[in-house]
Design a protein with these regions (language model features):
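A Lys-centered signature of the CheY-like receiver
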Residues: 9, 106
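Two-component/phosphorelay signaling modules centered on CheY-like receiver
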Residues: 11-32
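Helix N-cap/capping motif at the beta->alpha junctions
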Residues: 33-42, 64
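Short amphipathic alpha-helix used as the core "switch/output" element in two-component signaling
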Residues: 42, 65-76
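Receiver (REC) domain active-site loop signature in two-component systems and cognate sites
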Residues: 59
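C-terminal output helix
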Residues: 108-117
Length: 121
């Protein structure tokens, strides 16, 4: 069973992602939530065992690109999948070069989540 951290400034989107993860039939145990990159780093620093991080790109305080850099700068190798409405290849390339493992575009279905995340967790 996997513990997952969802980092997104929209509480509604965090709930949708959480529900979709469970509907996809993925082996999910705990789901932790953070409203931006700073909160996400705090969850990680708390010592919780996390096997997957899902992060939005556009967030206040610390966006997803900065968040990925900070996670990797701390030596954390947990897979990070960017969840975004951004369609531009450049922003996805930047996220990947910062250390993101993959990306998925909103909106998505539970089946799409299963396909994208099934091999990771």
């Amino acid at each position: 069973m996997a513990n997952i951290l969802i980092v997104d400034d929209s509480s509604t989107m965090r709930k949708i992602i959480s529900r979709s993860l469970r509907q996809a039939g993925l082996p999910v145990d705990e789901i932790y939530e953070a409203g931006d990159g700073i909160e996400g780093l705090a969850v990680i620093a708390s010592g919780k065992s996390i096997q997957l991080i899902l992060s939005d790109i556009n967030m206040p305080n610390m966006d997803g690109l900065e968040f990925v850099k900070a996670v990797r700068a701390n030596g954390n190798s947990t897979p990070i999948v960017m969840i975004t409405t951004e369609g531009g290849e450049e922003i996805i390339k930047e996220a990947m070069s910062n250390g993101a493992s993959d990306s998925i575009k909103k909106p998505f279905t539970p089946d799409q989540l299963q396909e994208k995340l099934g091999s990771i967790i």
